[in-house]
Every structure is written in structure tokens, then in C-alpha cells.
């Protein structure tokens, strides 16, 4: 670990319709359902992930559970931002004296529009990212299983998610 790593943390995020997975230092540090529970009137976060899922359908009328992603893209920007912020807190990437500059790589579906792509980038930046890079989900899957994506050989990737399924060659 170098001196600069004290000031910068790099995380990779698979922001999925059903689940969100966050990696830091090649380890899965968050693997939670993509759901958030908030107070209906104040929009204060009550719970995210597994705790929010346990509340889903069993909550008091003043508590609202939200799945902020639909079909692989952001359907509720504010809820996505709050959920991401809470998941990032779970990663253990906080600094000792001040928060580190976060660099994020986020997976996106191949067929999303520029507006949907911008929503992902904005949500990450509002959640504290200083630098955001977006990568298509099939490419991330290929790199994740060790395929040399620059090699001249063809490979087929099938990515089956909760909201989208993609096949890439």
C-alpha cells in the first residue's frame, strides 16, 4: 500500500436491479439487495440492503421501501444516490482524519441511453465519487473471469441479471 492510497480509494460497483455488489482491493465488501427503506415524510434513510428487504411489505405506513433500479437502469435518482451512499459507508473505505477521494468503476447495461448513463454517473458523483468510469456489464464480466479482452480470440459472455440479460461476443 503506497502513500497515495491513504488519500484515494478505488471501488468497483455492480449496481443491479436485484442486488448491488461492491469490490475493494479485489474483495467483495458489499453484496446486498438493491432496496432502501425511508421515512415517507422526511425521506430519511431507515435501512438499506438486507435490512430494508426484511422490512419490505411489513412496514408501518410511514416507512416506504423502494427498489430504485428498474430493468437495469435508475428509476429513482434520489433513492439510488442515498442507497449508494449507505453501501459505500459499508465498504470500510473511510479515512482516519478525512474521507478519501473515491474512484469508482460502475457496470452499466450495454443498451442504455445517454440520459440513463448520465444518471448513473451523477448518482455516483453525488454519492461521493471524485472520478467515475463506466464499463458495460459483459465487458466487466469478461475481465472478472480473467478473459484477455484484447486477445484476437472470440469469447461469448452471457450475463444474466435481475433486470437485464445480455449476450456479448
Q: Model-predicted segments: where are they?
A:
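Nucleotide/phosphate-binding catalytic cleft detector across ATP-hydrolyzing
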Residues: 1-162, 168-169
Amino acid at each position: 500500500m503506497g502513500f497515495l492510497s491513504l488519500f484515494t480509494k478505488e471501488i468497483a460497483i455492480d449496481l443491479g436491479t436485484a442486488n448491488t455488489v461492491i469490490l475493494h482491493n479485489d474483495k467483495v465488501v458489499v453484496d446486498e439487495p438493491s432496496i432502501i427503506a425511508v421515512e415517507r415524510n422526511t425521506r430519511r434513510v431507515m435501512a438499506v440492503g438486507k435490512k430494508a428487504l426484511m422490512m419490505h411489505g411489513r412496514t408501518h405506513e410511514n416507512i416506504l421501501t423502494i427498489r430504485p433500479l428498474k430493468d437495469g437502469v435508475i428509476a429513482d435518482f434520489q433513492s439510488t444516490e442515498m442507497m449508494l451512499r449507505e453501501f459505500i459507508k459499508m465498504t470500510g473505505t473511510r479515512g482516519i482524519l478525512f474521507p478519501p477521494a473515491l474512484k469508482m468503476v460502475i457496470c452499466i447495461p450495454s443498451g442504455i441511453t445517454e440520459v440513463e448513463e448520465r444518471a448513473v454517473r451523477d448518482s455516483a458523483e453525488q454519492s461521493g465519487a471524485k472520478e467515475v468510469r463506466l464499463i458495460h456489464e459483459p465487458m466487466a464480466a469478461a475481465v472478472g473471469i480473467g478473459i484477455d479482452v484484447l486477445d484476437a480470440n472470440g469469447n461469448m459472455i452471457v450475463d444474466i441479471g435481475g433486470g437485464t440479460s445480455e449476450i456479448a461476443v
